[in-house]
Amino acid sequence: IPAEPLFRSLESWREIGGKGMKLEDEWNQILSKKNEKIKIELKNFIYNSNFDKIQKIINDEKIKYYESKPSMATRQCSSLVIESISESMPQLIGGSADLSGSNNTKTKNSKVISSKNFNGNYIHYGVREHGMAAAMNGLALYSGLVPFGGTFLIFSDYCKPSIRLSALMGLNVIYIFSHDSIGLGEDGPTHQPIEQLSGLRSIPNLNVFRPADINETLECWEIALKSKNTPSVIALSRQKLPYINPSLKNENKCALGAYQVNLTSHESRVTLIASGSEVELALETQKELKENNIDSKVVSIPCHEIFDKQNEAYKNQILEPDNIIITIEAGSINCWNKYIGAKGLSLGIDKFGESAPYKEVYNHFNLTSNKIVNLVQKMLRN
């Protein structure tokens, strides 16, 4: 295919700028003729979100799911959150890079935006992750809109330049990345993210959330919506996960980045820290440790960036530095070593994945409760 040089690039750029100025003038003239009520309504739409209403919806949803305690993939959890808040938040503009059905970003409240109809709230971006992320930056820059867009976590690499600019410019953009680990199973190493979470967590001013159940998903979405000057990544599982929330509270447990899920004794000698799907594994490990007369504490850390900003007293309360600290995540361990101290251990995967049913892949990489218990027993003996 011949590549034609852009001889008129500067001229075309100026033409487009002139067209934009003309459209802006026309818009301002129309707005100037509207009554004050409409002007105030527009200003509120652009600058103010009705978080009181959103907060009530989220709290009501937390109560509902505390009663039913559903087991579901967190990509499904995220879809339920979007569905519950979208009608009360018209600023929310969703989309996906050709993976709406897999990311679960499109709900029954979604109305597709097309070239013939801009009166919608959902964009089919096609297979163009970088273009999607760039477009979301544009939507967030000056419009009052809160864009979110979905793809697989492995394809976040295609979004990376625009994610970096979201963070650099301090934009309220929400990236929905599903299929977040070896838990996706048979698709194998080409689709199993290993280094992606660690890489995303290294970007300044970017909150990377990895919720473990519906309660954490609701809370991570709440934080992301309120983060006016910080973009968010919400990494979600393909596989079903159990409900792990220990108690019903209106307060946001994820708001400090990490919290205690379960404690078998105040004399615990081991702290098990995990995120997302591995919180289930930590709880299974805790149960087996207790059967072997070893008390432990399970901590969920849905957001490193927020937890790292807490004071030392809270960090010590959560981590208990005198304990043997074991971190568990089905991905690169690079971003976990800061938590383990001198005698702890980070468990994860620092090689490419394998194609097999997901439980077999976890076993292959020694991420099972039985293997972790044996490891803890050996560490305690030493």
Residue ranges and their predicted role:
Residues 81-88, 95, 102, 135-142, ...:
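Generic, well-ordered alpha-helical scaffold segments in large soluble proteins
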Residues 2-128, 138, 271, 275, ...:
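Conserved acidic/glycine
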Residues 2-4, 93, 100-197, 217, 219, 226-382:
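Thiamine diphosphate
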Residues 3, 7-15, 141-144, 168-169, ...:
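Conserved thiamine diphosphate
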Residues 88-92, 117-121, 142-146, 169-174, ...:
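Short coil/turn connectors at secondary-structure junctions
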Residues 75-84, 158-162, 218-222, 310-314:
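Short alpha-helical segments and helix-capping/turn motifs at coil-helix boundaries
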Residues 95-96, 125, 148-149, 175-177, ...:
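General beta-strand structural signal in soluble alpha/beta enzymes
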